[in-house]
């Protein structure tokens, strides 16, 4: 026996889970994803990674602009799904959708719930300097990531791990976890535990303001911020490159020894003074350019020790 599944997801993170469900023998009766969006230099419409995979599998794809209203609910119920699997879909599911599948809606969430409920759990965990995070399979409720948890896989966050590194580590783990959860659900053996009332922290969307590096902060905190925002959207500073202040992303860095006025470039290797200690820039990306080693960037733009970065 296999389950009839509606899959709902959009970005790369959701792709391995869809592939695992199809490979596991379940019948994916529909795939919901966000509509194609402009991308690339030509801003041509590009389907989401989930849509691209679904079409390769020959699965029916829906890209509704809303799931609210009786028509959307009726369309969803008409799929006759036993369960819905939701992975980074990017749209709120109203009660009429949540209540439609007899076995409920399962969500794969990239954190150890209830810590980091919300939109940016991977980035927030790294930015906060957390030593571990994980992936969880939960049953969805109307509240934001408040549902009971069935399965959890923990992962250590190493001191130099970026959000991109962690994202790539959690993707296959999450896919395997959901595969096991569906197997248990099929056998009637999937049990759910309510989330603790204590320890709730929300992973709000990243703002442009917090992506800018504040050199008056301690170097350790800035290091975590660089890791948590790499590769996207990228922590950044401003430097005068001859045409006024230009944005430069910092993709990799590490804490270093050094002192001086915050934001001062201390050497040719890319060490910048912070409120406490210093930050060594390792890899950067100037606006509109490819990523490069920080020392090469400084040498090419003739940014010498004593230069102030904003």
UniProtKB/Swiss-Prot annotation:
The record's GO CC annotations read: cytosol
Recite the UniProt keywords alphabetically.
Protein biosynthesis, Transferase
| Pfam families in the cross-refs | Formyl_trans_C, Formyl_trans_N
Q: What does this protein do?
A: Attaches a formyl group to the free amino group of methionyl-tRNA(fMet). The formyl group appears to play a dual role in the initiator identity of N-formylmethionyl-tRNA by promoting its recognition by IF2 and preventing the misappropriation of this tRNA by the elongation apparatus.
Q: Report the catalytic activity.
A: L-methionyl-tRNA(fMet) + (6R)-10-formyltetrahydrofolate = N-formyl-L-methionyl-tRNA(fMet) + (6S)-5,6,7,8-tetrahydrofolate + H(+)
Which positions bind (6S)-5,6,7,8-tetrahydrofolate?
111-114
Q: Can you tell me which family this protein belongs to?
A: Belongs to the Fmt family.
Whose protein is this, by species? Methylobacterium sp. (strain 4-46)
Any GO molecular function: methionyl-tRNA formyltransferase activity
- Keyword presence, Flavoprotein: no
Task: Tell me if Protein biosynthesis is a UniProt keyword of this record.
Answer: yes
What the entry lists under CDD domains is as follows: FMT_core_Met-tRNA-FMT_N, Met_tRNA_FMT_C
- Superkingdom of this entry's organism? Bacteria
This protein's name: Methionyl-tRNA formyltransferase
In the Enzyme Commission scheme, what number(s) does this protein have?
A: 2.1.2.9
């Amino acid at each position: 026996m296999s389950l009839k599944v509606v899959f709902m997801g959009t970005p790369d993170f959701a792709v391995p889970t869809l592939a695992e469900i199809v490979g596991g023998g379940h019948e994916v009766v529909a795939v919901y994803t966000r509509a194609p969006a402009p991308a690339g230099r030509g801003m041509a419409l590009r389907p989401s990674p989930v849509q691209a995979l679904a079409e390769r599998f020959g699965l029916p794809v829906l890209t509704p602009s809303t799931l609210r209203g009786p028509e959307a609910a009726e369309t969803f119920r008409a799929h006759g799904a036993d369960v819905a699997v939701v992975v980074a879909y990017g749209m709120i599911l109203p009660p009429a959708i949540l209540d439609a599948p007899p076995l409920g809606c399962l969500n794969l969430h990239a954190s150890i719930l209830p810590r980091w409920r919300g939109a940016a759990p991977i980035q927030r965990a790294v930015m906060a300097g957390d030593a571990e995070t994980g992936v969880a399979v939960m049953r969805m409720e109307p509240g934001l990531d408040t549902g009971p948890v069935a399965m959890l896989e923990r992962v250590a966050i190493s001191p130099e791990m970026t959000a991109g590194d962690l994202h790539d580590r959690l993707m296959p783990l999450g896919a395997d976890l959901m595969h096991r959860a569906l197997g248990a659900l099929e056998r009637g053996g999937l049990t759910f535990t309510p989330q603790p009332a204590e320890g709730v922290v929300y992973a709000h969307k990243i703002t442009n303001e917090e992506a800018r590096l504040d050199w008056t902060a301690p170097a350790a905190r800035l290091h975590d911020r660089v890791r948590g925002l790499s590769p996207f959207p990228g922590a950044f500073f401003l430097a005068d490159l001859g045409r006024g202040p230009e944005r430069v992303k910092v993709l990799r860095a590490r804490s270093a020894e050094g002192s001086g006025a915050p934001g001062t470039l201390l050497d040719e290797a890319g060490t910048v003074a912070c409120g406490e200690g210093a930050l060594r820039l390792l890899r950067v990306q100037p606006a509109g350019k490819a990523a490069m080693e920080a020392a090469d960037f400084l040498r090419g733009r003739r940014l010498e020790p004593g230069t102030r970065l904003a």
